[in-house]
Amino acid sequence: MNRQQLEGRIDIAPRTPGVYLMKDAAGKILYVGKAKNLKSRTRAYFSGTDSRAMIPFLVSRIHDIEFILTETEKEALILENNLIKEHHPRYNICFRDDKAYFNIRADLNEPFPRFQLVRRPRKDGAKYFGPYPSSASARETLQFLQSIFPLRTCRDAELKSRTRPCLEYQIKRCLAPCVGRINSEDYLQMVRDGVSFLEGRGNNLLRELRERMKMAAEQMNYEEAAFLRDRIRAIEETLERQRMVSMTFKDQDIFGLYREGHLIQVCILLIRQGKILGSRLLPLLKFEGETADMLSSLLMQYYDQSVDIPQEILIPASIEDRQVIREWLEEKRGKGLSILIPRKGRGLELLHIAEQNAEHGFKMERKSLDDSDESLRLLMERLHLRRFPRKIEAFDISNIGGRLAVAAMVTFQDGRPLKSGYRRFRIRTVHGADDYAMMYEALKRRYQGKENLPDLIVVDGGKGQLAVAFSLLKDLSISGQDVIGLAKERVNGVTVQGGVNKSEDRVYLPHKKEALYLSRWPAVLFLLQRIRDEAHRFAVSYHRSLKTRSDFMSLLDDIPGVGEVRKKALLLSFGDLARIREATVEELTQVEGIGKDLGEKIHAFLHNDQRSVEPSTG
């Protein structure tokens, strides 16, 4: 479609809200935008009235425009966000965070709730707190909660089946609701106290605890008063360590940006009840447009993934869609909020803190990327690769004598793990211990569609596995693809010509008889070893999980009266065979479908059976 045809399509575009998709000659989406008035918005791209720096580059590539009409501007905003996440257009900002940050979860609808760490919040009616800036901070918070609010940490199955208190009760880290040592009302009060602390209402909680301590002392319940006193002291010490930055006691997210060219680092300062809880550095973003456009899309994508939306969001620049985004966030949050651009005072000071953190994060990230680029450049040079190995995919096989065979693929982008690119394969067509055939199957299943090919394929193994990979690429008519084999150390203490120890990892290249040793280039060797080891870890963990489940199922197959339904019920309740061995008859009979007679049979069988139930070590 030429320029005249494009302008003709725009002339008949509706003057209603909606989304427009700009595509190149191959039909690939270059840019997704939203508009209150589709006709006037898209016309600006070709009339010269849109002064954004990216517009000439974008317009020169547009061959088609597609329109999707919506009822309201807010619907257009939501649809735009969904399309960007689905298609990742080049000229849109695309926030993709492969980290799964920890949240703390508590379901207050349960009779005896517990606090637990989860990675992905769900819409299940529970309360979620987070995400925490690091796993260490999340675990530290959970440990603190458990030290001053002695709630259960056990799974639901253990809570229902236990007949005597566990060790946690003995060391005063749990009040044993499993055996009725605390009633539901008192237990829930302690959970609510923990929730108050997580919500940042520590001062309110302290006032309430002091009142309850005073009342307990007046009633001569000195044990309860002492218990409350210790909790008060622990909370006071924690609150003293938190820096008060605002006397308004508000919950705020403050977005600081640092930009060099197309690269943008974002730091979010997390403030709850006027105190800095921490900061969160987002992955380095690449965006060719204006900062204001980036901010709109970033707010949509960031809060679309979050369950923790504060009452104030501070941003460094004005955005066109602020009102619509605010309405969308209020709907998600269930109450009002503000999106502000601070011009003076404490808000501006906090924004500067966030921006300084963003700049520091950018420089650290840039140095890391520069180091990775140097390692990748050396890798390309030493191995004579055709392309710069920005995207690398590595494969490993795991099995025991051909049993429960699996393959794993890991992806590294710019020298770093890209978890969204990991894949696991349960080997389907190979019977017996044939690692070569297993590798062929895994490679075929990954590359037969010829989509999103990497710059480099790494297979774990020597000449044989490399030959398999090379053969597979030939069978699929994939040419020009770099592939190498990385063999683990085999022989110790044997020196070959040139003084190279043969115990070193060896790299095998197509059409080369001799292996290449990389000890002279430690950065390259370390990178390849890290990739190989991650593929091995991923494969072994998958195989181990399958083996544990298989051992569990096969052992229970020998018990009369235990079929598939009861096996699954036992697995769901106890998790693994070792826990079932530890269970009493009474605990076994708590599982649905298992009465006293069958529980006794299972208990007797497991304690007479001598087969190992230890998990595979790979």
Swiss-Prot record:
Residues 203-238 form the UVR domain. Keywords: Cytoplasm, DNA damage, DNA excision, DNA repair, Excision nuclease, SOS response. It is found in: Cytoplasm. GO terms for biological process: nucleotide-excision repair; SOS response. One of its GO terms (cellular component) is excinuclease repair complex. GO terms for molecular function: DNA binding; excinuclease ABC activity. InterPro entries: DisA/LigA_HHH (IPR041663), GIY-YIG_endonuc (IPR000305), GIY-YIG_endonuc_sf (IPR035901), GIY-YIG_UvrC_Cho (IPR047296), Hlx-hairpin-Hlx_DNA-bd_motif (IPR003583), RuvA_2-like (IPR010994), UVR_dom (IPR001943), UVR_dom_sf (IPR036876). The keyword Zinc-finger does not apply. Residues 15-93 form the GIY-YIG domain. It comes from the Bacteria. The keyword Cytoplasm applies. It holds the Pfam family GIY-YIG. Belongs to the UvrC family. The UvrABC repair system catalyzes the recognition and processing of DNA lesions. UvrC both incises the 5' and 3' sides of the lesion. The N-terminal half is responsible for the 3' incision and the C-terminal half is responsible for the 5' incision. Interacts with UvrB in an incision complex. This is UvrABC system protein C. It comes from Syntrophus aciditrophicus (strain SB). The gene is uvrC.
